[in-house]
Swiss-Prot record:
Subcellular location as annotated: Nucleus; Cytoplasm, Perinuclear region
Organism: Drosophila immigrans (Fruit fly)
Post-translational modification comment from the UniProt entry: Phosphorylated with a circadian rhythmicity, probably by the double-time protein (dbt). Phosphorylation could be implicated in the stability of per monomer and in the formation of heterodimer per-tim.
Any single biological process term in GO: rhythmic process
Main location: nucleus
Subunit structure comment from the entry: Forms a heterodimer with timeless (TIM); the complex then translocates into the nucleus.
Protein's recorded name: Period circadian protein
Lineage of producing organism: Eukaryota, Metazoa, Ecdysozoa, Arthropoda, Hexapoda
Keywords: Biological rhythms, Cytoplasm, Nucleus, Phosphoprotein, Repeat
General function of this protein: Essential for biological clock functions. Determines the period length of circadian and ultradian rhythms; an increase in PER dosage leads to shortened circadian rhythms and a decrease leads to lengthened circadian rhythms. Essential for the circadian rhythmicity of locomotor activity, eclosion behavior, and for the rhythmic component of the male courtship song that originates in the thoracic nervous system. The biological cycle depends on the rhythmic formation and nuclear localization of the TIM-PER complex. Light induces the degradation of TIM, which promotes elimination of PER.
GN (gene name): per
Length: 63
């Protein structure tokens, strides 16, 4: 799951190198920090994390 998520996010974050490094660090941590209170369900949080990250990157690129 982590490898797939990082790969997809890497494609979207090609424009911003800073965001790319941030996403990579989050993936290594198990994306538990992204979930916050949902850290208990690491597997569920990791699956829900990529879509949110992609949305944020797209909004930044549009600006």
């Amino acid at each position: 799951e982590g490898s797939g998520g990082s790969g997809s996010s890497g494609n979207f974050t090609t424009g911003s190198n800073v965001r790319m490094s941030s996403v990579t660090n989050t993936s290594n941590a198990g994306t538990g920090t992204s979930g916050g209170g949902n850290s208990a369900a690491a597997s569920g949080a990791s699956v829900n994390a990529p879509p949110v990250t992609v949305t944020l990157t797209e909004s930044l690129l549009n600006k």
